[in-house]
Amino acid sequence: MAVKQVEPIDVVLVGGGIMSATLGAIIHRLEPTWRIRVYERLGNAAQESSNPWNNAGTGHSALCELNYTPELADGRVDISKAVTVNEQFQVSRQFWAHLVETGALPEPSNFINPTPHISFVWGADNVEYMRKRYEALKDHPLFAGIEYSDDPAQIRKWAPALIPGRRKDQPIAATYSAAGSDVDFGSLTRQLLDGLEIDGVEFEASHQVSRISRSKISEGWVLDVRNEIGRSKSRIAAKFVFVGAGGGALHLLQKSGIPEIRGYGGFPVSGEFLRTDDPEVVQKHAAKVYGKASVGAPPMSVPHLDTRIVDGKASLMFGPYAGFSPKFLKQGSVLDLVMSIRPHNLRPMLAVAFSNFDLVRYLVGQLLASKSTKFDALRDFMPTAEPGNWHRITAGQRVQVIKPDKDKGGVLQFGTEVITSADGSIAGLLGASPGASTAVPIMLAMLQRCFPERWAQWEPTVREMVPTYGTDLGDDPALADRTLEHTAKVLGLHH
């Protein structure tokens, strides 16, 4: 099969989700003359993890997610991870605000809406933890305005659905931030890609990249591509490749042969949510409320009751309920897990299997749980919830990163991991939450690693897009306040 064109494409983005769309939007502004092409296996963009019903749509800024503020052995609450996540989200907010201001994105309410973020717990020990967490966060510039209460009357004002039907003697506590958001990453992805297409970026739907290999005739890569309509095959050359194919990224990076992927594996976790579109139920709750994971449960198990705004219509979602599927993509193959096993990642995968009994126990418990048991988890948040008003939906597949470790053999990593080749000509993204919310800083950091020789000339443009890039807002309260106020105004959020 011959290479289709003599001149290689400057940039090929594999996968039509939020990561590729974000990277394409950034590169196009840094190098407007570069030829960029996006390949998407399915018939349209944002059909897997970026689809609004395949994720909870939380603009992850650690305002309410308790897994980012663990309690240490000495009783103190560590907020360092929360600060990092919030700093990253502010970079994304600045980039989105820049695109809105320059007309590259239309009305922001099409993809982001103000939604209060609430942490909610019950039980005396959890109430004490919540109080300590609030004390640790309240004076930080990025968490200014956060409120705390253990008064049911006040909590009812913040989130009316949490209180009716609850035992009056149950200790409860909550924190509230009006600065939260709900993000439709599917809409954002499509709008970014639509804008890129208008500017000449090529988007090829229904095209699957089946193999990536080093070019033997020039620097860069050769990609084998199959048109899913008609099944025709082609081979194209690219100078730089980004594999943003979600759960499919591991397979393609393995096929590329880069040594940096050696030892890495993936652990797929499926998920379900309960959803209601009933207007009477939806109007009782307008917030994202995150609880506390059970003792020993993994971070992915944190339960939350979410307002979702998709296509201008409000709904509620509760979950996640975890399950197991060997697929790496929702529309993937049951052989995905088996086909990802290599001699170099077998030891890390076995090490993770033997050292994560809490995760195994959690997954088995979720798989064996009855419908009534699962619904009781929703009633912990909304005591008056009725099964007839809710239906189950299947979320996107999450592939947790199994990372090689010298001491333990392998560790299970929650979050995202960027893999880049030594020469910076190929990169890929593995992992899950809070990926979409932090897409902009992740992609900027990746570009800095892959194109170090260009970064100095790119930096002025980066500063136009993200004025505080490289600065910790937490170290400058005045700058943090100005930045949050500006992006909130542009994006229609609360400050």
Per-region residue spans from a language model:
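Short beta-strand to alpha-helix junction loop
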Residues: 80-93, 121-128, 175-195, 204-206, ...
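Dinucleotide-binding Rossmann-like beta1-alpha1 core, especially the glycine-rich loop
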Residues: 57-157, 314-315, 325-327, 333-336
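Flavin (primarily FAD) binding-site architecture
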Residues: 243-259
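Short hydrophobic core segments
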Residues: 12-14, 39, 235-248, 443
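Helix-loop-beta segment of a Rossmann-like dinucleotide-binding subdomain
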Residues: 107-120, 157-199, 222, 232, ...
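Glycine-rich FAD pyrophosphate-binding loop
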Residues: 28-52
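Helical element adjacent to the flavin cofactor pocket in flavoenzyme catalytic cores
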Residues: 170-240, 437-451
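C-terminal catalytic lobe of FAD-dependent flavoproteins
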Residues: 170-179, 187, 324-457
